[in-house]
């Protein structure tokens, strides 16, 4: 039996709501419904009664519940033991491309320079979208996530690492927003909520990317502007702030599993400044 089906069953039984279960599992609601139907077809019984938003376990669902919990607990323990033997010296860090390019690349270098912390460790620098990395963290496929937005889930620990400043940059001096095309560099879902007010509600990005390097290289060719970290942009050179723009402060968080067996190691690694300028 597919353990993902049991995992979905347990989440729906816990939340009694397909939408909330989908949110917790980082799936669409239709995917959750499909998994429940698959499990019901395999068992030949209905597991839930559905009356509008009132979802309850059937008698068969109630009987399955303790077995599903035991099976998932055993499976998680097995995965943990196998993973521990195969990757006890490995440590994976996940973040978006722009965070790696603008600040985490330098931090990784500092980790390697600090012999006391990294002795024997094999680091993996993983690049992906935040939602994918949160899922990997939840499933113990990732050790540490660096992000601009802390997930609101009880099983995660979080540490505020500091703040960095974003400014709107272009390739030539004395430019106004109205004269430039907008390139959207992804800085997290909460940043996008502010974008309309910062750029203009009717501004359609000419390019969307998660890479700061790519965005920086394209702004001259596209007569564009994009939000970049101030400290990084100054080091790159050849960039100018847009005259009629503002700056924005963004938080940076470290996220890891509360019951991670690498808790002590994570806290040691985070003693080495992630940001060049912390305030």
Swiss-Prot record:
Name the InterPro entries for this protein: LTTR, LysR_subst-bd, Tscrpt_reg_HTH_HdfR, Tscrpt_reg_HTH_LysR, WH-like_DNA-bd_sf, WH_DNA-bd_sf
Q: Supply one GO BP term.
A: negative regulation of DNA-templated transcription
According to the UniProt entry, its GO molecular function terms are:
DNA binding; DNA-binding transcription factor activity
Write down the DNA-binding region ranges: 18-37
Q: Which Pfam families match?
A: HTH_1 (PF00126), LysR_substrate (PF03466)
SUPFAM superfamilies in the cross-refs: Periplasmic binding protein-like II (SSF53850), Winged helix' DNA-binding domain (SSF46785)
* HTH lysR-type domain segment(s): 1-58
**Source superkingdom:** Bacteria
Q: Which UniProt keywords apply?
A: DNA-binding, Repressor, Transcription, Transcription regulation
Transcription among keywords = yes
Q: Which family does it belong to?
A: Belongs to the LysR transcriptional regulatory family.
Give the matching NCBIfam families: PRK03601.1
Role = Negatively regulates the transcription of the flagellar master operon flhDC by binding to the upstream region of the operon.
**This protein's name:** HTH-type transcriptional regulator HdfR
Q: Which organism is it from?
A: Escherichia coli O45:K1 (strain S88 / ExPEC)
Source lineage: Bacteria, Pseudomonadati, Pseudomonadota, Gammaproteobacteria, Enterobacterales
């Amino acid at each position: 039996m597919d353990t993902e089906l049991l995992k979905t069953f347990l989440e729906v039984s816990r939340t009694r709501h397909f939408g909330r279960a989908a949110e917790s599992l980082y799936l669409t609601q239709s995917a959750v419904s499909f998994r429940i139907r698959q499990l019901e077809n395999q068992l030949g019984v209905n597991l839930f009664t559905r009356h509008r938003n009132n979802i309850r376990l059937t008698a068969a669902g109630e009987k399955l519940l303790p077995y599903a919990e035991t099976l998932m607990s055993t499976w998680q323990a097995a995965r943990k033991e196998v993973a521990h033997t195969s990757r006890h010296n490995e440590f994976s860090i996940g973040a978006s491309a722009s965070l790696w390019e603008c600040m985490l690349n330098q931090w990784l270098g500092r980790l390697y320079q600090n012999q006391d912390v990294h002795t024997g460790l094999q680091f993996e620098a993983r690049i992906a979208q935040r939602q994918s990395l949160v899922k990997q963290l939840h499933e113990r496929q990732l050790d540490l996530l660096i992000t601009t937005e802390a997930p609101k889930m009880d099983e995660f620990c979080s540490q505020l690492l500091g703040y960095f400043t974003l400014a709107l940059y272009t390739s030539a001096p004395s430019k106004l927003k109205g004269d430039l095309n907008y390139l959207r560099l992804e800085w997290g879902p909460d940043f996008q909520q502010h974008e309309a007010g910062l750029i203009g509600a009717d501004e359609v990005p000419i390019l969307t990317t998660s890479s700061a390097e790519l965005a920086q290289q394209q702004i001259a060719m596209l007569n564009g502007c994009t939000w970049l970290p101030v400290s990084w942009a100054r080091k790159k050179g050849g960039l100018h702030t847009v005259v009629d723009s503002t700056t924005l402060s963004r938080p940076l968080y470290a996220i890891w599993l509360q019951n991670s067996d690498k808790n002590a190691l994570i806290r040691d690694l985070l003693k080495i400044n992630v940001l060049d300028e912390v305030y």
